A protein has these predicted regions:
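Glycine-rich phosphate/pyrophosphate-binding beta-alpha loops
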Residues: 50-82, 162-164
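Carboxylate- and glycine-rich phosphate/diphosphate-binding segment that chelates Mg2+/Mn2+
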Residues: 1-59, 169
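Active-site pocket-lining segment
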Residues: 76-140
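C-terminal charged capping/lid subdomain of soluble metabolic enzymes
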Residues: 112-186
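Alpha-helix N-cap/helix-start motif at coil-to-helix transitions, marked by capping-box chemistry
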Residues: 12-23, 80, 95-99, 122, ...
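Short alpha-helical scaffolding segments that buttress acidic/His motifs in well-ordered protein cores
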Residues: 1-2, 45-53, 83-86, 128, ...
Length: 186
């Protein structure tokens, strides 16, 4: 949902659903993951995921999904590959979409209303990274059998996802893509 909100194709329609989905997801994922019996949190996650799907139909996805697609070769689940790359792509994009991240932060975390745009953008990216940590998603692609010698393939295959990369707020060069993958190849 954050990816939808920061897409070049974002619209007021997709923003409405992305914000609603983000609010539900950010405020329920820890409880839904940590407490198998918390049906309210799980139902909120389900509704948040639905809202995210509606948002995607209006805004499309960006570099997060573009760089995740080549990881399917290694049988990494789509959601896991997105999660591994998400905060790194958002950090790369931050200077081009920090205002959008700040607006989303206002909708999801109103208690940060008095913070600066940069603080709000950093907080949103930090929350993404924290969710990956709390849900025990591996952050190193080598855990899935990806090797450093696969880097050139990943860079080329990621850069070939033009239909998604054109939605990204910031253009990615081959070197930019390489740097993002290097952050998750330890």
């Amino acid at each position: 949902v954050v990816e939808c909100f920061t897409s070049k194709k974002a619209t007021p329609f997709s923003d409405t659903y992305a914000t609603a989905g983000a609010k539900l997801i950010f405020h329920n994922i820890r409880e839904a993951y940590g407490d198998a019996d918390n049906m309210e949190a799980k139902n909120n996650m389900m509704l948040g995921a639905f809202y995210g799907g509606v948002a995607i139909t209006g805004s499309g996805t960006t570099a997060v999904h573009a760089l995740s697609y080549p990881l399917g070769k290694y049988h990494i689940a789509h959601g896991v590959s997105n999660a591994i790359l998400f905060a790194h792509v958002m950090e790369f994009n931050k200077d081009a979409c920090k205002e959008r991240l700040a607006v989303l932060c206002d909708g999801v975390f109103p208690e940060f209303a008095t913070k600066s745009v940069d603080e709000k953008a950093d907080y949103m990216i930090g929350q993404i990274a924290d969710i990956v940590k709390v849900t025990n998603i591996p952050t190193d692609l080598t855990e899935f059998g990806v090797k450093m010698e696969d880097l050139d393939f990943l860079v080329q295959a990621g850069s070939d996802q033009k239909r998604l990369l054109v939605n990204n707020m910031k253009e990615l060069s081959l070197d930019d893509i390489r740097e993002i993958y290097l952050k998750v190849l330890k």
